[in-house]
């Protein structure tokens, strides 16, 4: 399969730079996986699409202010993007500089360069940085960090992004990108879903900066997926198995929830799904056998991204590309701050041949 099979034309004007004033007021494109039928609606229509007893699985990661500016003590300007927090003092990060710092280099971080840190080691493209400060990494990031808006949101981060670029149920700090499908859920909608009898469970996947890395190979089977830490606790496993047992659906909110659940299913030894606390490099593209997820809430993804490949594996390649074509024609808003889709699983997707 070629990466170019997942390309589509997207006018610049359809990339959303700000979210809707009200989280749940965005548009919703419904894609029926088995037939490919499309229905246009608004996000709150989700309420009518879910049945009592269906299980919504959310990702409760919280975005950290992961972008830092500063300079090397020796002079040159640097930009640091945290990939993950290693412990209370150390981070693993991407560093952009005219000349990469060497191990032992002193860094002066923050807009006022008040935070002292040392680059201690290099691991491939990533740098290990230790803060020389009594405060924890999280406290330092909260005081001097900028929200890591995706590269296609072409504006500086604003104070408002600290809340707008978080889900209302975010709980565990560690992501450098929001699980954006969840941005559309506000408290009134969650309350109505609960009142209807829709069940809810929470996994954690700390989204890494790798989520924005372009696929740099021609053939997708050659792509090496970035690694992210995921947690699928016992209560989620129990909720999934119970939903399946009573004939209800498991609905993943976002591709990160999909990847968490399907990673836990892949690693399971005895049951359909078992608890999972580990790094995952799961790469889902057409031909993948889904085991857990029956329906998916997701935003519109970048052309040639691993995420549009994941959706194609779920709904079927042709159905997915047709839906994206319709979304462009109907001027849906794309990417992190954009509109959403609700997609049901297409069991025939696995048999589809792409690009032949």
Swiss-Prot record:
Q: What are the recorded Gene Ontology BP terms?
A: queuosine biosynthetic process; tRNA wobble guanine modification
Q: Which Pfam families match?
A: Queuosine_synth
> Which cysteines form disulfides?
none
Q: What is its EC number?
A: 2.4.99.17
MF GO annotations = S-adenosylmethionine:tRNA ribosyltransferase-isomerase activity
Location of this chain's protein in the cell:
Cytoplasm
Respond yes or no to whether keyword S-adenosyl-L-methionine is given for this record.
yes
The cross-references to InterPro entries, in alphabetical order and at most eight, read: QueA (IPR003699), QueA_dom1 (IPR042118), QueA_dom2 (IPR042119), QueA_sf (IPR036100)
Reactions it catalyzes: 7-aminomethyl-7-carbaguanosine(34) in tRNA + S-adenosyl-L-methionine = epoxyqueuosine(34) in tRNA + adenine + L-methionine + 2 H(+)
Q: Can you quote a single GO CC term? A: cytoplasm
Keyword Ubl conjugation among UniProt keywords: no
UniProt main location, coarse: cytoplasm
Key words of the record: Cytoplasm, Queuosine biosynthesis, S-adenosyl-L-methionine, Transferase
What is its pathway? Answer: tRNA modification; tRNA-queuosine biosynthesis
The text of the family note is:
Belongs to the QueA family.
**Which HAMAP family does this one have?**
QueA (MF_00113)
The record's note on quaternary structure and interaction partners says: Monomer.
Q: What does this protein do?
A: Transfers and isomerizes the ribose moiety from AdoMet to the 7-aminomethyl group of 7-deazaguanine (preQ1-tRNA) to give epoxyqueuosine (oQ-tRNA).
What is the designated name of this protein? S-adenosylmethionine:tRNA ribosyltransferase-isomerase
Q: Gene for this protein?
A: queA
């Amino acid at each position: 399969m070629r990466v170019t099979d997942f390309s589509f034309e997207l006018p610049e004007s359809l990339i959303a730079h700000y979210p809707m004033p009200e989280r749940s007021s965005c548009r919703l494109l419904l894609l029926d996986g088995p037939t490919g039928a499309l229905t246009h609606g608004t996000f709150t229509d989700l309420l009518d699409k879910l049945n009592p007893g269906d299980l919504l699985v959310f990702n409760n990661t919280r975005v950290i202010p992961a972008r830092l500016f500063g300079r090397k003590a020796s002079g040159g300007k640097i930009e640091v993007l945290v990939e993950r927090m290693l412990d209370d003092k150390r981070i693993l990060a991407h560093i952009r500089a005219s000349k990469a710092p060497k191990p032992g280099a002193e860094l002066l971080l923050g807009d006022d360069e008040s935070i002292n840190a040392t680059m201690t080691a290099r691991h491939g493209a990533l740098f290990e940085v230790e803060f020389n400060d009594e405060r924890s990494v999280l406290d330092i990031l909260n005081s001097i960090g900028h929200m890591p808006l995706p590269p296609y949101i072409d504006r500086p981060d604003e104070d408002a992004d600290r809340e707008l670029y978080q889900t209302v149920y975010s709980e565990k700090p560690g992501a450098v990108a929001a699980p954006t499908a969840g941005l559309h859920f506000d408290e009134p909608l969650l309350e109505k879903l609960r009142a209807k009898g829709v069940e809810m469970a929470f996994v954690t996947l700390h989204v890494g900066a790798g989520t924005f890395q372009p696929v740099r190979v021609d053939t997708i089977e050659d792509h090496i997926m970035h690694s992210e830490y995921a947690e699928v606790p016992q209560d989620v496993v129990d909720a999934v198995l119970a939903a399946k047992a009573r004939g209800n659906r498991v609905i993943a909110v976002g591709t990160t929830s999909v990847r968490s659940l399907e990673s836990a299913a892949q690693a399971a030894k005895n049951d359909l799904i078992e608890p999972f606390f580990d790094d995952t490099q799961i790469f889902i593209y057409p031909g993948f056998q889904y085991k857990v997820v029956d329906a998916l809430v997701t935003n519109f993804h970048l052309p040639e991204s691993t995420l549009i490949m994941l959706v194609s594996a779920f709904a079927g390649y042709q159905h997915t590309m047709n839906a994206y074509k319709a979304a462009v024609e109907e001027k849906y808003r794309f990417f992190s701050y954009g509109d959403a889709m609700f997609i049901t699983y297409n069991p025939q997707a696995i048999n589809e041949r792409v690009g032949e």
